[in-house]
Each structure stands twice: as structure tokens, then as C-alpha cells.
């Protein structure tokens, strides 16, 4: 049987891994200037868009928080997988 403590530890490891991966891909999203964010976003996420289109997108999305969205998705997927493991072990 899998203990809740082990499930929690596994979840924390996955979130830490996800954060590390995220920060290695998008270090400029934390405390960076808008031009740099625009350039990196364009390279990583919107290669077919112009700089102005990416900047317009950022200006239209003031509440956009890719880190929060990524963590929510990772947490959901981790919970699903760990829940399945717990159920199988039980």
C-alpha cells in the first residue's frame, strides 16, 4: 500500500522537476523587460508571429500567467497518475 506521505513526496518531486524545466526554458519571464519576454516568447511559443503580434498578445493578456497554468496542468496530471497508482496498489 502506498502511503500518503510517499504520494506527497512524489508530487513535490514532480512539481520541482516541472519548475526546473520551466525556468530553464523561460528564465526571462521572471523579472524581465517586455522586449526580452517578447523575443523569447516568439522563439519558443510563436515562431510564426511577428514581434509586434507577440507584444500585442502580451498587452491584451495582462493576467496571463504561464507558470500558474503549467503548474495547474502538471498538478492535475500528477494527481491523476498518482491516484491511479494508489488505487492499483490498494
Where do the language-model regions lie?
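Short, charge/polar-rich alpha-helical segments
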Residues: 3-4
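Acidic, low-complexity, intrinsically disordered interaction modules
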Residues: 26-88
Amino acid at each position: 500500500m502506498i502511503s500518503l506521505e510517499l504520494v506527497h513526496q512524489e508530487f513535490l518531486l514532480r512539481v520541482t522537476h516541472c519548475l526546473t524545466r520551466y525556468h530553464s526554458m523561460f528564465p526571462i519571464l521572471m523579472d524581465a523587460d517586455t522586449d526580452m519576454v517578447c523575443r523569447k516568447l516568439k522563439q519558443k511559443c510563436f515562431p510564426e508571429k511577428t514581434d509586434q503580434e507577440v507584444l500585442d498578445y502580451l498587452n491584451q493578456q495582462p493576467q496571463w500567467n504561464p507558470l500558474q497554468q503549467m503548474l495547474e496542468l502538471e498538478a492535475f496530471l500528477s494527481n491523476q497518475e498518482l491516484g491511479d497508482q494508489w488505487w492499483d496498489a490498494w
